[in-house]
Amino acid sequence: MANKTRWIKSRIRSVNETKKITRAMYLISASKVKRLRDRLDSTRPYFEKVNEFMKDLILHGIKTPHILFEGSYKEGKKKIGLIVISGDKGLCGGYNANVLRSTISLYENLAKEADVTFFPIGVVGRNFLVRHGYQVEEDFNYQTQSVSVKFARLISQKIVKKYYTGEVHEVYIIYTKLVSTIRQEVTVKKLLPLDKTEFGIEDDKSDEMIIYEPDPVSVLDIVIYEYIKGIIFGAMMDSYVSELAARMTAMDNATKSADEMIQKLILKLNRERQAVITQEISEIISGAAALK
């Protein structure tokens, strides 16, 4: 009986220690979510301007076919690049599993008619893809928690260069969009070739003429890097905030589960104590009766 009581007390202490950790992780994630959302909001106006400029350039400047819209594929087997943004760590509910499930589903559809190469951002996603034998770009190794405009620029330069040289004919990005702190959605977006309807352009005919120096095509070849950089940066930020929000929810649920477990253990401990007291009282009564 005494051994069982000691075991329950030890179990309560253990669960309490775990609860402290999950509570701390919840608070850290909550703090980071707010900070990163503020950071994302502060950079959004710049990339919105880039998007507006791209729209004006397409509508009023680009009047001839261009590889960024027409595509670089001519013949043979098509080559497709998938940028996959996952987390760097676990303990975030189904966040990583949802991203990878959607990734493999998309891969299975695309791989029927094309060679698919993965460009993973995030340790969990990269390890998963390498472990299961998928074709992964070797020199493409970025962590989600290192999200910055600098990294987004490096990634956009690599991706656009591979598109121009024909190493990939299409590029998709898979990331997690934050709907709310308790809801995140895996999103797939086609990066290249560009789709004019993405800019709200149904008909690119326009009577207005804008002069671009040195010429519209040269300007587009420069601005495309800023445009792709903006999408990648936004996707990385959205994904990282989603990971933290998922971790917040997971750690909050874990803390609540720990509270429930502690209450059950305390109830069990009290019952054991009551049983000990009842037994001792019974022994005293039996002893007193024997003396009479």
Curated annotation (Swiss-Prot):
Gene3D superfamilies: 3.40.1380.10, ATP synthase, gamma subunit, helix hairpin domain (1.10.287.80). It holds the Pfam family ATP-synt. It comes from the Bacteria. GO terms for molecular function: ATP binding; proton-transporting ATP synthase activity, rotational mechanism. It is a peripheral membrane protein. InterPro entries: ATP_synth_F1_ATPase_gsu, ATP_synth_F1_gsu, ATP_synth_F1_gsu_CS. PROSITE patterns: ATPASE_GAMMA. One of its GO terms (biological process) is proton motive force-driven plasma membrane ATP synthesis. It is found in: Cell membrane. GO terms for cellular component: plasma membrane; proton-transporting ATP synthase complex. Keywords: ATP synthesis, Cell membrane, CF(1), Hydrogen ion transport, Ion transport, Membrane, Transport. F-type ATPases have 2 components, CF(1) - the catalytic core - and CF(0) - the membrane proton channel. CF(1) has five subunits: alpha(3), beta(3), gamma(1), delta(1), epsilon(1). CF(0) has three main subunits: a, b and c. Produces ATP from ADP in the presence of a proton gradient across the membrane. The gamma chain is believed to be important in regulating ATPase activity and the flow of protons through the CF(0) complex. Belongs to the ATPase gamma chain family. This is ATP synthase gamma chain. It comes from Caldicellulosiruptor bescii (strain ATCC BAA-1888 / DSM 6725 / KCTC 15123 / Z-1320). The gene is atpG.
